[in-house]
Amino acid sequence: RIAESTWSTEEPEDGVFDFSHVTKVLEACEREKINVIIGTPTYAIPAWMAKKYPDIMVTDKSGRRPYGARQIMDITHHAYRFYCERIIRKLMEVVKDYSCVIGFQLDNETKHFGTSSENVQQAFVSWIKKQYQGDIERFNHDFGLDYWSNRINSWEQFPSVRGTING
């Protein structure tokens, strides 16, 4: 496997790409008849991305995590998803004609680290609202929310996914 967790090497600056380390390995593998699986670099974001989008770092019940460790970005963040698609498409353009490439790996260690960013909150409330066809009374009933004054009277009152309500 090659090319995974090398995003900062492949895109050292936003929109500046360098896949020379990938092509160097692929050329050697072609010569030696070694099969290669291409891994996506997306489970470790480059520093420029964290700087440009501070809210791309995962937000969990303790708050926003700092940049540094791998896999602590919010995989639901719009910018993360945009840049993932872009780097993967660029990488595929580079590797597509090498006969030694026999497959692709789309992250083997995807994690979410309990992400509870605002976009996760909104997506969850939209999903639950759809499941209940907007029937907030049925939702309150099914979850017993009248007890301990947990009842919600509008979907905007839905409690944060960062914690739980008493229950």
Question: Where do the protein language model's features map onto the residues?
Answer:
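Polysaccharide-binding and catalytic clefts of secreted carbohydrate-active enzymes
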Residues: P66-G167
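Aromatic-lined substrate-binding rim segments of carbohydrate-active enzymes
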Residues: R1-R65, M92
